[in-house]
Every structure is written in C-alpha cells, then in structure tokens.
C-alpha cells in the first residue's frame, strides 16, 4: 500500500566499543554468542514497547508508516562480529519479534547494523588431516566480514514469511572506527585483520538498485516507497549520489556510528526525507553518546516531539553496551510525496 504519512522513531544508544584506557578498547557483549544475541533481541523488544507506548506515536494508524531505526553496530557481540550461524539465528529472532500483524503491520524496522564474519581456509597439512578436517582456518589471510542492515517490514503473521518482507543492505566502505585498533583481549577482532565483502552486482555496473532483496545494494521499493540506505561512511562518500540510474528516493536512511547527515550527500526527492540514527556521540553537546536527525528536503530540520526510556529489568545492559540503554526519540508524523 501507499502511505500518506511517515513517522520516524530513533533509538539513540551508544554502540561504540568500551574504552579501557591507553588506546585499548574492547567490544561490549556477553561471552557466549547465543546469549549475546538473545539479550540484544530482548532489549530491542523493550525499545519497541517504549516506542509503541509513547503517546506521540501514531501506533496503528494505517495511513502512517512508522520507521524505527537503530544505530550501526547494534549487533556484533564480544568478538566484534557474529558467526554465520549466529547471524542467521539473529535474523530469525528479530523477524519473530515483529511478525504480529495487530501490533506491527504499519511499521518498518531498520535494525541498526549487524557485523558477521567468516574465515578463509587452506588445505590442512598431513599431520593436521590425521586428527581433523581436510581444511583449516588460514590465519595468514584476513577475516572476511560484512556489515549489513536488515530492513524489515512488520506484521507478516507467520515467521516463515519474514524474508518476503525484508531487504539487506551491505556497507561498502570500511572506516577506521569499524573495528577496534588495539584489542583488550577476549578474542576481539582488530581492524587490521578484516576485509569487507562487497554487495553483489552485475559486472561493470554502478547501479545501487536491488535485483534481489538480499543482494546488498542500497535502493529498493517497499510499500510503493523508494528507499535508499547508506551505512555511516557510505553516506559521507556519497554512495547514493554517485550511483547511476538512481530513481527518485522518498526516504534516505542513514544508520551510523560516527556520522551526521551531509548536505552534499543528500539525494531524497522533493517532499522526501533523510533520517539518521547515530550510535557514537551527541554532537549537540560534543560528548560520547548517541544522536538522531530528520531533515525534510523542502522543510529542513524536524524537531523531536517526545523521548522515552526503556524498561530494562532483567537485561544486563551494562555488559551489552558501554553507555547504557539510551533513549527512544519520536518525531512527528510527516506528509509523504503524493506521487
């Protein structure tokens, strides 16, 4: 369906690493991957409840699309990246949380970003094969990592239908902030060991329009709205602006950890909007924290109308995030372009 209005909701939570001093950092998270994922998904559920319960949220209004965004790096765990199995389990868990049609039919979730990893292998030596597999991890080669955003429409009733209502966008450019530089131990991945995997695309093209919903490109259509997603540095590097054959963008979405909306990177059409949720700093006060922005192409900056805190009872937030559970910020419902 085509919506008449859009309402942006940002969960402003610090998603940067924990600083230990003398330039040493560590990723915040639980030591067991499955427990870490379960705890973060539970915290997401608490944030969604806070957003729905806010009086300024239009909740179930069928004419208004609610766009709920988390910052970059919300899902990465104590090593800095989840295993392939962990990423698949995470997607299934998130989709299960937002499948209820009565609660989430008119919501679109931009689930921050998830960092996953895989290891390159080499043939095992003769002695290694005597006691193990034919192929082993090649520690001389970089870890293959992907930093991607799951964009999920809610209200699809059956969990098995979740993939039909989802898109995945891969980050293209790795910044110096994406991984810790000096590890505090505990198996944390340092940036020098990482190589990002690129999105899939036809050879020789510079189009960013998705052909398949999980191909990693940044432009897609959902509910007759054209959305463009840029993750942090991709926005500053004008990923969308430099793409060929870019269709008119209704909503430009920028989840980040260390980025603000850049005037020379905006591509949303007249009547459209740009929305940023950042997990690194409060740029108004100049301190570590989190922030959000909404800008109308024709109307300029949009002010927050309400803020809400989370009920975090029973969730070990201190282990998951370096600076607490943050806050949910609600913006007013805004008119969408008519055509």
Task: Indicate where each model-derived feature is located.
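CN hydrolase (nitrilase-like) catalytic-core segments centered on the catalytic cysteine
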Residues: 99-107, 232-338
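N-terminal, active-site-proximal structural segment of metallo-dependent hydrolase catalytic domains
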Residues: 1-77, 82
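Active-site beta-loop-alpha substructure in enzyme catalytic cores
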Residues: 69, 183-276
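Short, structured patches in soluble enzyme cores that scaffold and shape functional sites
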Residues: 12, 113, 153, 170-173, ...
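Cys-nucleophile CN-hydrolase/nitrilase-fold catalytic domain and related Cys-dependent amidase chemistry
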Residues: 48-170
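Low-complexity, serine/threonine/proline-enriched polar segments
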Residues: 135-216
């Amino acid at each position: 369906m085509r919506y008449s209005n859009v309402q942006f909701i940002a969960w402003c939570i610090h998603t940067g690493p924990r600083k230990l001093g003398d330039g040493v950092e560590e990723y915040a998270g639980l030591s067991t991957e499955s427990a870490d994922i379960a705890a973060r998904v539970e915290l997401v559920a608490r944030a969604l409840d806070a957003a729905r319960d806010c009086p300024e949220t239009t909740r179930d209004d069928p004419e208004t699309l609610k766009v709920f965004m988390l910052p970059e790096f919300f899902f990465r765990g104590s090593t800095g990246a989840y295993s392939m199995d962990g990423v698949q389990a995470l997607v299934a868990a998130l989709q299960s949380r937002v499948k209820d049609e009565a609660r989430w039919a008119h919501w679109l979730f931009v689930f921050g970003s998830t960092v996953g990893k895989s290891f390159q292998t080499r043939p095992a030596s003769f002695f290694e094969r005597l006691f193990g597999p034919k192929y082993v991890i090649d520690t001389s080669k970089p870890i293959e990592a992907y930093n991607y955003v799951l964009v999920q429409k809610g209200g699809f009733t059956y969990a098995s239908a979740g993939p039909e209502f989802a898109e995945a966008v891969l980050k293209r450019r790795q910044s110096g902030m994406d991984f810790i530089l000096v590890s505090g131990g505990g198996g944390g991945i340092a940036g020098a060991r990482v190589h990002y995997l690129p999105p899939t695309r036809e050879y020789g093209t510079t189009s960013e329009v998705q052909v398949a919903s999980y191909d990693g490109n940044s432009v897609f259509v959902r509910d007759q709205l054209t959305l463009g997603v840029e993750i942090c540095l991709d926005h500053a590097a004008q990923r969308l602006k430099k793409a060929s054959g870019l269709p008119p963008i209704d909503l430009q979405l920028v989840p980040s950890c260390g980025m603000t909306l850049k005037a020379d990177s905006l591509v949303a059409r007249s009547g459209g909007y740009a929305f940023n949720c950042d997990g690194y700093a409060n740029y108004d006060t100049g301190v570590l924290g989190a922030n959000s922005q909404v800008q109308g192409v024709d109307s300029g900056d949009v002010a927050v109308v309400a803020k809400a805190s989370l009920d975090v009872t029973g969730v070990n937030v201190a282990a998951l995030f370096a600076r607490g559970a943050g806050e949910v910020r609600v913006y007013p419902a805004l008119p969408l372009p008519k055509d």
